Amino acid sequence: LFAKNQEAADYLKARFQAREIKKTYLALVVGDIKEREGIIDLAIGRSAKTPLKRVAIGKQRGKIREAVTEYKVLNRYEGLAPSPAQSGIEGFTLVEAYPKTGRMHQIRSHFAAIGRPVACDKLYSGKRFMCPGGISRQFLHAAAVELTLPSGGRIKLEADLAPDLAEALNTLEIAKDREE
């Protein structure tokens, strides 16, 4: 989302600060989230160990800021190992995440804090690092933003899933169909 002039930039900045822009992300997380939907309401601060990392639970330093993420489960891929070396894992859960606050690494930090790190996330997964075949980056996609225009109308801008992420989901779907 880019502004073409200063007036538009100021308008967008004000909407973001007032939390009036709805952001939607798709994330594939490690393990099974049992609830169909939920809210993660955990403050986030800079990690005392790793300055690039933001943590919701544990040793934090600096300013601790409010952070809220709502989510909805879209699909479950239970017990599907991404490779023979990772057999016995709990599988993955595809979620739609809606950050209500705009903290750096908020979604990654929040899902890691509840024991369901984003797939392929080397910074936040720790010992739970799992990655479905075919992708080499975290499975987190900015899917849409929705906002009110100065005219009062609403607009929703959507971004297609990148080919590597779409292929990884397709592979998980095929494996799921075989299991059923």
Regions found by a protein language model. Name each.
Residues 2-180:
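RNA pseudouridine synthases
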